C-alpha cells in the first residue's frame, strides 16, 4: 500500500503540486493577521484579531471536495478551528496534524505583494507560505489523497487534520481561541501529533522547547511641561537606567543538555506623549525563554532584585508564562518520520530542542506525544519575502501519507 502511495505521487506530482499551490494561494490572499488587542486599531480592515474564519471557510470547502468529514469548533464565530478526520478510530491511536491559519503582519520592504503568492524558480513567496498556510495546504491535500485512494477502510486509527486559530500571539486578556481551547474543552483527544511549524527543511525534529515569559515593566515618573523638566520626573530616563541593569543581568540557572541556556530580549519600549512633555510613564516588554529548572517564582524574584538596583518606582507584571518541555526522542512518531524520510529523501531527521514556541509544547504539556517537523527554512519565518520551496511541500505531503499509514494501520 505504501508503494502505491509513492507510485501515485510519482505519476501525479505536477497535479499535486498545483493543488497545493492553488490552496496555499487562496489561504495567503486572506489577511488573517493576529496582533494583541491594543494594536488592532493599526489594521482597520480587521474587526477582531485573526479573523481566521476567512481561511476556515476555504478549508471546509476543500474538505467537502475531498470527502473528508469535519467539525468546526469556535469559542468566537470569527475565530474558528476546523478539524477533519480520516480513518475508523477503532485502534485508539489518533494522529493530529495541526497548522495555524493566523499570520503575523507583513511589515515593510517586500519585493512582491505579501498577500499574493508569487512563484519564481520553484519557490513561493508570500506572507504565510511557510508560517503556516503552505504546510496547512499540504496536510489537507495529503488527507485528500489518503481518502481518494483508500477511504477509511485500511486505517483503524484516525488522522485528525486541524486548521487552528490563535497561534501567533498571546493576548493580555489571556483568552485562547486555538489549541488550548480545544484541549481544555476536550473537543479533540489525539494520542500523537505532528506540528509542521519549525522549518529545518524536514531535517530536524523538535522534541523540546524552551518556556516563555512575557514581562511588562512600567517606570513611573511625574509629568511636567517640557520647558520646566526640573518640576517633573522623566520616566524615560528612569527606564534607561533600568535597561542598563537588564543588559548586565545574568540569570541564575542550570544549563540544559538539549535546550541550553535561557535568553532575554527587550523587544518593545513605549513612553512619552509629545516632545514638550516630561513623560510620566515608560513601559518595556521583555521576552524571556526559559529552560527546565528556572521557575516563574525564581525568574520574577531575579527581575525584582534588578528593579531595586535602580532609584525609582517601577511596576512589573508577568503577561504570559509557559513551561518548557522535553519529549523522549525514542518514540514511534520520531521513528516513523526518520524511517520514511531516509527511505524517500535519503536523510534521517535528527531530534533537537528550540527556543521558539509551537503547538507541540502545548500538546506535550497536556500529555500528548507531539513533535515539531515540517518543510521550509527556519530563516524564512516572519521575514520580508517569506519563502517556501514547492518541492518540499509535495515531499512533505507524501511523507505525511506514509507516516500516517505506519502509525494508523
Describe every region a protein language model picked out:
Residues 1-15, 54, 71-76, 105, ...:
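Metal-dependent amide/peptide-bond hydrolase catalytic core
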Residues 2-124, 148-155:
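Acidic/His- and Gly-rich active-site-bordering loop/insert found
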Residues 93-95, 123, 160, 191-193, ...:
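Structural motif
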Residues 98-99, 162-164, 193-197, 218-220, ...:
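Short beta-strand segments
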Residues 123-137, 225:
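Glycine/serine-rich anion-binding loops at beta->alpha junctions
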Residues 132-208, 408-409:
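Acidic/histidine-rich catalytic neighborhood of metal-dependent amide-processing enzymes
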Amino acid at each position: 500500500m505504501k508503494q502505491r502511495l509513492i507510485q501515485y505521487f510519482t505519476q501525479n506530482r505536477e497535479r499535486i503540486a498545483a493543488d497545493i499551490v492553488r490552496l496555499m494561494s487562496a489561504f495567503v490572499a486572506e489577511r488573517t493577521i493576529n496582533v494583541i488587542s491594543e494594536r488592532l486599531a493599526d489594521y482597520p480592515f480587521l474587526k477582531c484579531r485573526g479573523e481566521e474564519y476567512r481561511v476556515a471557510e476555504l478549508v471546509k470547502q476543500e474538505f467537502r471536495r475531498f470527502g473528508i468529514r469535519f467539525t468546526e469548533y469556535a469559542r468566537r464565530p470569527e475565530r474558528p478551528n476546523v478539524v477533519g478526520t480520516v480513518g475508523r478510530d477503532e485502534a485508539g491511536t489518533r494522529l493530529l496534524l495541526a497548522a495555524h491559519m493566523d499570520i503575523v503582519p507583513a511589515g515593510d520592504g517586500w519585493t512582491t505583494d505579501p498577500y499574493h503568492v508569487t512563484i519564481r524558480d520553484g519557490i513561493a513567496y508570500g506572507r504565510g507560505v511557510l508560517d503556516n498556510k503552505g504546510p496547512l495546504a499540504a496536510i489537507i491535500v495529503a488527507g485528500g489523497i489518503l481518502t481518494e485512494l483508500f477511504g477509511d477502510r485500511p486505517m483503524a486509527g484516525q488522522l485528525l487534520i486541524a486548521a487552528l486559530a490563535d497561534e501567533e500571539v498571546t493576548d493580555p486578556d489571556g483568552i485562547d481561541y486555538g489549541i488550548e481551547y480545544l484541549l481544555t474543552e476536550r473537543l479533540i483527544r489525539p494520542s500523537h501529533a505532528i506540528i509542521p511549524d519549525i522549518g529545518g527543511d524536514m531535517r530536524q525534529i523538535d522534541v523540546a522547547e524552551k518556556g516563555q515569559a512575557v514581562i511588562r515593566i512600567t517606570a513611573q515618573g511625574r509629568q511636567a511641561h517640557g520647558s520646566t523638566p526640573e518640576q517633573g520626573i522623566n520616566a524615560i530616563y528612569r527606564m534607561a537606567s533600568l535597561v542598563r541593569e537588564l543588559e548586565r543581568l545574568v540569570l541564575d540557572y542550570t544549563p540544559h543538555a538539549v535546550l541550553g541556556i535561557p535568553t532575554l530580549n527587550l523587544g518593545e519600549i513605549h513612553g512619552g506623549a509629545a516632545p514638550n512633555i516630561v513623560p510620566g510613564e515608560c513601559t518595556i516588554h521583555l521576552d524571556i525563554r526559559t529552560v527546565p529548572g528556572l521557575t516563574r517564582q525564581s525568574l520574577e524574584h531575579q527581575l525584582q532584585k534588578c528593579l531595586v538596583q535602580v532609584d525609582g518606582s517601577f511596576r512589573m507584571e508577568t503577561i504570559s508564562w509557559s513551561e518548557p518541555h522535553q519529549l523522549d526522542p525514542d518514540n514511534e512518531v520520531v521513528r516513523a518520520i526518520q524511517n520514511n524520510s531516509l527511505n524517500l529523501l535519503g536523510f534521517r531527521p535528527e531530534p533537537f530542542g528550540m527556543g521558539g514556541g509551537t503547538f507541540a509544547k502545548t500538546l506535550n504539556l497536556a500529555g500528548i506525544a507531539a513533535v515539531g517537523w515540517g518543510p521550509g527554512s527556519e530563516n524564512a519565518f516572519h521575514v520580508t519575502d517569506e519563502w517556501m520551496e514547492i518541492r518540499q511541500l509535495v515531499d512533505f505531503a507524501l511523507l505525511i501519507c506514509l507516516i500516517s499509514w505506519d502509525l494508523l494501520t
